[in-house]
Amino acid sequence: MDASLLDVAITALSVLLEPERLFYLGMGTVIGLALGIMPGVGGVAGLALLLPFTFNLDAYSAFAFMLGLGAVTSTSDTIPAVLFGVPGTSASQATVLDGHSMAKNGEAGRALSAAYAASLIGGLWGAF
């Protein structure tokens, strides 16, 4: 059976864009944002906590759920680092140094915007 690369890519895209997969991707993203805001509960702990919920899912939905959760925890740990001075994970330790002092001076929005812009640029650069 000879399948071209384009046929396989179209099949993979159709599987990815099914509403059930998009729902689990969105749920993983929302839960990952909530877990990332809590200091000490990062991506690895979140994946370990939510792994039992994936046992009854098909492989694609479970992967979409875990991918959504893992992708946003390093972005959402910026919130406690800037606002409270407590790094959510080790990835946000440097954010505490500049971001929390900016928040003390009333520039929390500017610190969060800079952190999210850097996260966006890094994510896009890493994707390509």
Q: Which positions does each model-derived feature cover?
A:
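Residues at alpha-helix boundaries and the short loops/turns that link adjacent helices
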Residues: 16, 89-90, 106, 127
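Membrane-interface alpha-helices at helix entry/exit sites of multi-pass transporters
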Residues: 60-64, 101-121
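Internal alpha-helical transmembrane segments of multi-pass membrane proteins, especially GPCRs
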Residues: 18, 27, 67, 113-117
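Helix-loop-helix hairpins and the membrane-proximal interhelical loops
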Residues: 1-60
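Transmembrane alpha-helical segments of multi-pass membrane transport proteins and ion-pumping complexes
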Residues: 29, 33-37, 41-47, 73-86, ...
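Hydrophobic/aromatic residues in alpha-helical transmembrane segments
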Residues: 46-50, 67, 95
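A cross-family phosphate/adenosyl-ligand binding-site feature
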Residues: 7-11, 58-68, 76, 107-108
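Short amphipathic alpha-helical coupling elements at transmembrane boundaries
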Residues: 11, 94-105
